[in-house]
A protein has these predicted regions:
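Conserved HGGG/HGGXW glycine-rich cap/lid loop of the alpha/beta-hydrolase fold
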Residues: 124-187
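Conserved alpha/beta-hydrolase catalytic His-Asp/Glu region
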Residues: 274-319, 327-328
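Catalytic active-site module of serine/aspartate enzymes centered on a nucleophile-bearing elbow/loop
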Residues: 362-395
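Flexible "cap/lid" loop of the alpha/beta hydrolase fold
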Residues: 227, 231, 238-271
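Conserved acidic catalytic loop of the alpha/beta-hydrolase fold
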Residues: 196-214
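Short beta-strand/loop motif that positions the catalytic acidic residue
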Residues: 332, 338-340, 344
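DNA-binding patch around the recognition helix
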Residues: 2-4, 10, 24-25, 37-42, ...
Length: 395
């Protein structure tokens, strides 16, 4: 999205503020403050809300936020006296004081490196057709993302939730991702939706692309698939990046009574409301995946959910609850980076920490976010990119 006000344009896809077309330097936290204020320009934003959005669970003094507001005003040719752009409501918070026009990215902006994604199909060991896509830097080292719950190659490419992942990770890498069996453009009547079948699907995709050596990016349940594949084929995996993942599903966790009720409630929500025209049931998942998202992003989750049959959604969810890769994780001998959001509502932080303790030599990076899928406007996304690029060696 591009937000225009006066001589300025805030481009959230490019993570950039421009003045009369020229990029302006902003520190990550200052940029995040601007994004949040602009995205919620129709109302007052409290200081507490900004602090929770930018710094998460860390303790900061009011002076820290005020210094970021001051830096933002300087960048916008504003000041605390005139408050032309950023207005302070004493004792309450801040709001945008100028008219802001929002427009979607031009279609060409969704192309990566001037090209679109290339979608192809391959067959898994049991004949199921798996849809996969390649995009990004064709001459870069391969980076493969094992599938996670709820994907659709075409839908994700244009989404307000995933497109910055695809574009940024494709800058330095030939980025390869696929729809898991039962989802998206892959066969929906797959029959076998077991964990072993998921690993075999990853094997089919990398073999179809004739990849000899590559890195894996596991997200959520994709972390377990990446681990299992690496143990089977250690000679083919260069490095492992695991974000928002876990070694054990809900069935093997020491859950509180409240967490057990939550798990049962989510399963029943899928059974009862997944196929209904009323989106209320499906929107629960959107707010769990991206609690700090916008209505547009929650609507995207609702639209995505409608592409997946209820029976498949439930079967895949129940299979994720039965995951246990602890014996495989301790057997890894591959450089591994583990990242996890402290406030993740879908996969609690402790699961990521435990995963990192199981993998020999793994480095663990906590991220200050409540989102299971990082959004492009939050500081945690910039930190994620910096850590991953430094680890993989990409620009």
């Amino acid at each position: 999205m591009i937000y225009e006000f006066g001589d300025f344009a805030l481009d959230t896809r490019r993570h950039e503020l421009r003045r009369s077309g020229e990029p302006q330097h902003l520190e990550p936290q200052v940029y995040a403050v601007l994004c949040h204020l602009v995205e919620h320009r129709d109302r007052l934003v409290t200081a507490r809300e900004l602090i929770e959005r930018i710094w998460g669970h860390r303790f900061i003094t009011p002076g820290t936020l005020n210094s970021r507001i001051k830096a933002l005003r300087r960048a916008l040719d504003d000041d605390g006296t005139t408050q032309r752009v950023i207005q302070t409501v004493r004792g309450m918070g801040f709001r945008i004081g100028v008219d802001v026009k929002a427009r979607a990215d031009p279609p060409s902006a969704l192309a990566i490196g001037g090209t679109s994604q290339q979608i192809r199909f391959c067959r898994a060991h049991d004949g199921v057709r798996i849809a996969y896509a390649t995009s990004g830097n064709a001459s870069g080292s391969p980076l493969v993302k094992p599938a996670n719950w709820l994907t659709h190659l075409e839908h994700d490419w244009n989404s307000a939730v995933w497109r910055h992942w695809v574009s940024e990770l494709g800058r330095a890498h030939r980025f390869i991702r696929y729809d898991e069996r039962g989802c998206g453009l892959s066969d929906h009547n797959a029959g076998d939706l077991s964990f072993d079948a998921w690993v075999c699907d990853l094997e089919a995709v990398v073999d179809a692309e004739r990849l000899e050596r590559f890195s894996l990016l596991g997200i959520s349940q994709g972390c377990a698939v990446a681990i299992a594949y690496t143990v089977r084929h250690p000679e083919r995996v260069d490095k492992l990046v695991l974000y928002g993942g876990y070694a054990v599903g809900r069935n093997y966790r020491n859950q509180t009574p409240q967490q057990e009720i939550e798990g049962s409630l989510l399963r029943n929500l899928v059974r009862v409301g997944w196929g209904r025209d009323n989106p209320a049931f499906r929107q629960v998942f959107g707010t769990l995946f991206v609690p700090e998202g916008t209505p547009e992003q929650w609507q995207w989750f609702n639209d995505l959910a409608r592409t997946l049959p209820m029976e498949n959604a439930l079967s895949i969810m129940e299979m994720t609850h039965g995951i246990d890769v602890r014996p495989l994780a301790v057997a890894l001998d591959t450089p591994t980076l583990v990242l996890h959001s402290r406030g993740d509502a879908m996969v609690p932080f402790e699961n990521g920490r435990m995963l990192a303790t199981l993998i020999p030599g793994a480095r663990f990076v906590p991220l200050e976010s409540r989102n299971h899928v990082l959004l492009e406007t939050e500081p945690a996304w910039a930190q994620f990119l910096e850590e991953v690029r430094g680890f993989l060696g990409g620009a």
